[in-house]
Amino acid sequence: MCASFSPTLDSRSRQLLRTLISCYIQNGEPIGSKTLAQQAGLDISPATIRNILADLEELGLLNSPHTSAGRVPTAHGYRMFVDSLVQMQPPSEDDIRRLRVEMTGGGTQTLLGSASEILSAMTHFVGVVSAPRREQFVFRHIDFVPLDARQIMAILIFADNEVQNRVIEPRRVYEPGELERVSNYLNAHFIGRTLADIRTTVLCELRKAKDEMEQLLAHSLDLASQMLVPNDSEDIVVTGQTRLMALQDLSDMDRLRELFEIFASKREILQLLERTIDAPGVRIFIGEETGMVSMEDISLVTAPYAAHGQVLGVLGVIGPKRMAYDRVIPLVQVVAQVLGTALEPPTMP
C-alpha cells in the first residue's frame, strides 16, 4: 500500500471512523451522529459521538459537506481506513473455483483478457492488466523470412503458442539458404530459454573477436543481436470503462472525459501500474496519490502477478474512492494468484 496516514486514535474513535466510512461506502450519503449511534455498537451518547466526529474532522479524516449535517471521509480518511481499519471479505471458495475455471486454457492474451473482464464484472468498475514483456517468456522456435533486399522478418514462436513478428534490417544481404542455416542454429542452441537470457548470451559472445568464431555462428549472433532489441511497446488490457459513467461519484463530465482519454491512450495507466511491479502484495492509490489530476476522485487497487516466481505484470481495479475496499482488495489478490498459476504451464521455464 502507499504511504499510510495513521494518527493515533483511541478505540472509540477508530470504531466510529470505521463505521462511518463503511456506511458511506454502502449508501453514498453523508453520515450523521444518529446513524452512527445505531450502527457503531458503542454505548455512548449522540453528543459524545458529535464531539468525536469533530475531532476526526480536525485531524483531516472527515469532511462536512455544506448541504448536510452529516460527514464524509476525506482521502486521508480512506487511507487510514484501508491501512488499519478495513475488515476484509475475501471471495468464497466457490467463487475462487469459478475463477480458476474461467482462467483455464487459452493463450496468454486470452488469459489477460479474462482476468480484466473478471475484475470488472465482479466489482462493476474498470479492470486493468498489464501484459508481460515477451522477453520474459520461453522461446520455442524461430524462422526468418526475407521481405526484400534489405529487410527480414523474424517470426518468433513462444512456449505459450503466442507468435511475434519483428522486422529487422541486417548489416548485409542474406540468401534464403543462409537464413535457413541461421534459424536452424538458433533453434538448436537456444530453444527453451527466455529472450532476455538469449540476449545476454548473444551480447557476451559478440564481444569475442570475429576471427575466433565460425562464420555461421557470427552470422547467427549478428542477426540475433538485431532481433533481440528489447520491445518497450508493452500493452495493457482495459475492460469496463463505461461502467464509470453510471456512478454518481463521477458525475463531472469534464473530469470523466479526461479519464476516458487516459484509458484510450493507456500510456499513463501503464506507467502507474509499472510503479507497483516491484512491490510485493497489494498497493492502493487513493485520489491524488495517483499523481494525475484527472484521477483525484479515483482509487486504484493493484497487485503483481507472477509465474514460477518471476513477476510478469500488474493487474488491478480502477474505481471511485468510495469503493468496497473490503471486497476489492482480496479479489485483486486472488485474481493475481489465479492468473499467475494459469500462466505457468507451459509459458515459463
From Swiss-Prot:
NCBIfam families per record: hrcA
Listed name of the protein: Heat-inducible transcription repressor HrcA
Single GO molecular function: DNA binding
Listed GO biological process terms: negative regulation of DNA-templated transcription
General function of this protein: Negative regulator of class I heat shock genes (grpE-dnaK-dnaJ and groELS operons). Prevents heat-shock induction of these operons.
Protein family membership: Belongs to the HrcA family.
Cross-referenced HAMAP family: HrcA
Organism: Xylella fastidiosa (strain Temecula1 / ATCC 700964)
Annotated keywords: Repressor, Stress response, Transcription, Transcription regulation
Pfam families: HrcA (PF01628), HrcA_DNA-bdg (PF03444)
Keyword Transmembrane found: no
